[in-house]
Structures are given as C-alpha cells and as structure tokens.
C-alpha cells in the first residue's frame, strides 16, 4: 500500500503547531575573557588558583592558532532499538550527507549526541540549532542550549533530551535537516545538512 503524502495545508499546520512551542530567551552574554586573562586574574590567591586549575585544567594557551577553536566531530542518533550505529563523521565530506539518509522507525525514542572539541579559549553559550523541512516546507525549528566549555584534550559530548520520532501514515517519509553549531558571538562553528527517513519498520 502506497504511503499517503501530507498536503501543503497539513505541512503548514504542523509548522504552525511547532512554532507555538518555540521560545526565545532574552539573554545577554557576559564579556569574553581569554584563558590567559582568567589565569592572570588574582594569581596570588592560592585557593582561587587551585580552583581555576580544577575548572580549566593545565591549559596550554599557545595552541596552534591555525586550528579552529571549536571542532565539531560527530553527530550520533542514540537509539537503543536501532539495529546498527547511526552516526555522521563531521570531519569529512559534509556534502555527501545530502545523498544519504538515516532510517528511523516511527515512534521510537531517540536522542541526538554531538561530539566536539574546544582547543584554545573558553566558548560561552554554545547552541545546537536544527531546522527540519518536509517537501521544502520548514515544519520545525529547535534550539538546544549546549553551554560554556573550556579547552581540553578530550572531546566533549552533548546529548539532547529524549524525543519520540513522529508516527503514523502522514509522518512517514523523508525529512531534510539543517544543523548549525554556534555560540553567543554568533560564530558558525559548523553548519551541515542531513536527511532522515521515517519508516514503519527499521527495514521495510
């Protein structure tokens, strides 16, 4: 039996319902300071120095200036019932993602995991922004506040709250997703597009 495609009116209705759930936060970011400036502040205060070291680690501020401060390495769809890994390597050819698609079974619970590194300076107010399109119509926009992070050798991981994949005949089909990783300074650390296909079963 052929899948029933949603009409333009139904897509507009979905977009309107999702728009009602969007909230803008009136937030003014603090003035940015470099790691070196933070380490120099109150450097004679031993307890404060130890606190900063615990917070920031022993940071080498002379990191290669040619390497981006923030590198987003992977996007993973975390789903306990998935038959295999659902992962995008964001250090490679981003254009290739437009030609492939994740398959997600309708109604399953999943989370999005973003893996990233911070190399030199503290980054304040990082956000993961996701716009979802169906047949060229934007039906959803979600902003996730990732937070502020300092440099370290190990990768950080950010997990979105648990979500449920859409379900039902009208929900099945292909979705185009435009993702962006940004911060308080509106620096575009990485933007990429990827595709998601909602199916009745993992493989049908």
From Swiss-Prot:
Gene3D superfamilies: Coagulation Factor XIII, subunit A, domain 1. The modification Phosphoserine is found at residues 34, 47. Residues 1-36 are annotated as: Disordered. GO terms for cellular component: cytoplasm; immunological synapse; membrane; nucleus; Schaffer collateral - CA1 synapse. Disruption phenotype: From 1 week to 12 weeks of age, progressive deterioration from mild to massive albuminuria as consequence of renal abnormalities. In kidney, severe podocyte damage, glomerular lesions with focal and segmental sclerosis, along with prominent intratubular casts and luminal dilatation. Tubular epithelial cells show degenerative changes with basement membrane thickening. Increase of apoptotic cells in kidney glomeruli and tubulointerstitium. It comes from the Eukaryota. It is found in: Cytoplasm. InterPro entries: Ig_E-set, Rho_GDI, RhoGDI_dom_sf. GO terms for biological process: regulation of protein localization; regulation of Rho protein signal transduction; regulation of synaptic vesicle cycle; Rho protein signal transduction; semaphorin-plexin signaling pathway. Disulfide bonds: none annotated. The modification N-acetylalanine is found at residue 2. The modification N6-succinyllysine is found at residue 141. In kidney glomerulus, expressed in podocytes and mesangial cells. The modification N6-acetyllysine is found at residues 43, 105, 127, 141, 178. GO terms for molecular function: GTPase activator activity; Rho GDP-dissociation inhibitor activity. PANTHER family: RHO GDP-DISSOCIATION INHIBITOR, RHO GDP-DISSOCIATION INHIBITOR 1. Belongs to the Rho GDI family. Monomer. Interacts with FER. Interacts with PLXNB3. Forms a heterodimer with RAC1. Interacts with RHOA, the affinity is increased by three orders of magnitude when RHOA is prenylated. Interacts with PSMD10; the interaction increases ARHGDIA association with RHOA, leading to ARHGDIA-mediated inactivation of RHOA and ROCK and prolonged AKT activation. Interacts with KANK2; the interaction is direct and may regulate the interaction of ARHGDIA with RHOA, RAC1 and CDC42. Interacts with RHOC. Interacts with CDC42. Interacts with NGFR (via death domain); NGFR binding decreases the affinity for RHOA. Controls Rho proteins homeostasis. Regulates the GDP/GTP exchange reaction of the Rho proteins by inhibiting the dissociation of GDP from them, and the subsequent binding of GTP to them. Retains Rho proteins such as CDC42, RAC1 and RHOA in an inactive cytosolic pool, regulating their stability and protecting them from degradation. Actively involved in the recycling and distribution of activated Rho GTPases in the cell, mediates extraction from membranes of both inactive and activated molecules due its exceptionally high affinity for prenylated forms. This is Rho GDP-dissociation inhibitor 1. It comes from Mus musculus (Mouse).
